[in-house]
Amino acid sequence: MKKKFATVIKMAVCSLLAVAVPALAQGEAFRITTCAVGAGPDSVAVADVNGDGRLDLISANNLADTLTVLTNNGAGGFGSNATLIVGSGPYAVVAVDINGDGKPDLICANNLANTLTVLTNNGNGGFGPNATLNVGSYPVFVVAADVNGDGKPDLISANNGASTLTVLTNNGSGGFGSNATLTVGSGPYAVVAADVNGDGKRDLISANYYANTLTVLTNNGSGGFGFNATLAVGSGPLAVVATDVNGDGRLDLICANYGTNTLTVLTNNGSGRFGSNVTLTVSGLPHAMVVADINGDGKMDLISANFSVYPNAGTLTVLTNNGTGGFGSNSVVNVGLQPFSLAAADLNGDGTVDLISANHGDNTLTVLMQTGGSLPRLSIANTGLKTFRISWLLPATGFVLETNANMSGTNWGAAGYLITTNGTTAGVNVTSSVNHLFFRLAK
């Protein structure tokens, strides 16, 4: 399924109130493709697994005990699916070259087996042999980072059932040893490795779902960690990322709070301490998050994947960065059912950032490719009691005005209003007494 969307606006009828909601990525066009994968995809990774210079997709299929590899055909499509058997309950996957041969290997966290599976890349997109690494109870996340300064990527798992992180150091040939166990807050669901205190060493930050906190563990430079700091955030944090949101050269922290439908932004004071918390509201139940310059202005924007309530489609919320640590232009696009994970990468080599969600509820990946051009934007104005004019700039060749009562992914239909033109604009006149209507241009 492929479709382009322009602005989505919300018409709220309450006395003479009309509210316009900006388009995704300030009007940037996306081509949306749905890719079938294994049952219950809970994570997606991006890497060139077959060495053809194109970024491929890898999903961790929690209910199938498999990974699915979809190779990029170079034109924005994906095929040549391969299925890889891993441990029980793969919940997260990461792609990184662990043995120094220049090829991205795959590592997944198996939450029912309390293990990591390591699959080495043979150079043409095939993988083997598998290695199994024991970690803590119920690992739900894995990240690769050089934590001891030897130039080799180590592995860190977030063990939700044990409230710990497991650190496995890389011996340089693809093997791992010297496991360390680090205690964090209750129910860690994600971990990020980032230098938050400016000493050149990768620190660890976990998002602790049951504790409603982040734990910051500073790196001593030899692979050990100390000075635990606890940061209060919203209810049920499921994801955490590190990026410089205000342009001061320091890595700030952002977490997605599933229980409060919010993101928390914590600014870095330069010594690894955090303050000036800002709360950003997103649409229902944020489950994952990435940072990426989605609109090409050189500033890192925030994108959350929102689980939503079944049977409503999941959504992505995009919040654009104003460059001083603030975020605006909150905008929404529909994806598949129950998006668990999110990735951002330039999949078609056009210089713009594309988005990929792993949708647990319908066994798919949703791929949103930026087309590189702006779409016509809708605007709304009151013209009388319970009457509105919805308009857009011409030309808008090939676009159809659609409406929906609830922003679901399945109930959009042709609006059916008479379109009239006035010089450089086209539009429709709407009379309605319902509380909310949503409109979009679709192609």
Spans of model-derived segments:
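Beta-propeller blade termini
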Residues: 42-49, 91-98, 140-147, 189-196, ...
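Short glycine/acidic-enriched loop and turn motifs that connect beta-strands
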Residues: 63-65, 112-114, 161-163, 210-212, ...
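Bacterial N-terminal signal peptides
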Residues: 10-22
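Short, composition-biased motifs enriched in small/polar/acidic residues
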Residues: 373-443
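Blade-level signature of beta-propeller repeat domains, shared across WD40, Kelch, NHL, RCC1
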Residues: 340-374
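Hydrophobic beta-strand segments that make up the repeating blades of beta-propeller
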Residues: 57-60, 106-109, 155-158, 204-207, ...
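Blade-edge motifs of beta-propeller repeat domains
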Residues: 22-39, 71-88, 120-137, 169-186, ...
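Glycine-aliphatic tripeptides that mark coil-to-beta-strand junctions in extracellular
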Residues: 53-55, 79, 102-104, 151-153, ...
